[in-house]
């Protein structure tokens, strides 16, 4: 399985946190009020050389406060690539397309978009569908990993079932596993993009060494025709509790 707070409430605070975490937390699936999977996409942002820090400051000063107030902007979680600090991958979760429209057309977002132009080299949006969006209701994660998997099409249904089960189990049972997010490309449903959020390095290593994780990986590894892992720079992801309706 596998993807800093850019503009919103529950995102990574490479650029500064907005919400305080509580040590007492429980696990939940992010859903709409009707119980449906929310709208999901990935934004891959590339800055000019050395420009990511400036882009973060711009986001924090423009669109960040607005995003925190938007009820339909559930989460903006991401990380900066440890191998290329000019690249950030951001998982965006919205209640609906209308919620995304409200976010992306707001005056604050337009101000952010205009101000970042001098340091923005490239932006790519990848439409996706959620498979598992599991997280604790509170917490601050310092370690983020992302993966891209290509699943053998005939194995996709079984992969989705096993992965959903393990994502829920890990977030529920493992104290240091704060979030497990699994998505499929909209136009290529066997291409999987994941994000894992851990409290710290120790929590990551403990999960990787656990019997449950080892068993899960033994089951799903034969289902992949390609795997790619992204390790992200250390940061602070402050979890959002938007999209959690059974608190």
Go through the PLM ranges and name each one.
Residues 51-73, 108-112, 155-178, 212-216, ...:
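Short amphipathic alpha-helical segments
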Residues 140-200, 206-207:
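Conserved small-residue-rich
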């Amino acid at each position: 399985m596998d993807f800093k707070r850019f503009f919103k409430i529950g995102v990574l605070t490479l650029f500064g946190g907005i919400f305080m975490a509580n040590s007492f937390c429980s696990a939940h699936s992010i859903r709409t009020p009707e119980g449906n999977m929310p709208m999901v996409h990935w934004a891959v942002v590339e800055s000019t050389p050395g420009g990511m820090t400036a882009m973060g400051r711009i986001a924090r000063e423009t669109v960040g406060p607005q995003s925190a107030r938007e009820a339909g902007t559930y989460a903006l979680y991401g990380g900066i690539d440890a191998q290329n600090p000019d690249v950030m991958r951001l998982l965006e979760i919205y209640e609906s397309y209308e919620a995304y429209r409200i976010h992306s057309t707001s005056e604050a977002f337009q101000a952010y978009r205009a101000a970042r132009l001098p340091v923005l080299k490239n932006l790519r949006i990848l439409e996706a569908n959620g498979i598992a969006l599991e997280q604790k209701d509170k917490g601050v994660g310092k370690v983020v990993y992302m993966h891209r998997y290509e699943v053998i099409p005939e194995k996709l249904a079984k992969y989705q079932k096993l992965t959903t089960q393990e994502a829920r189990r890990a977030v529920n049972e493992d104290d240091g596993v704060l979030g497990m997010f699994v998505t499929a490309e909209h136009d290529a449903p066997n291409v999987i993009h994941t994000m894992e959020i851990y409290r710290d390095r120790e929590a990551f290593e403990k999960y990787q060494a656990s019997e449950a994780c080892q068993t899960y990986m033994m089951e799903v590894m034969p289902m992949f025709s390609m795997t790619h892992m992204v390790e992200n720079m250390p940061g602070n992801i402050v979890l959002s509790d938007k999209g959690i309706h059974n608190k």
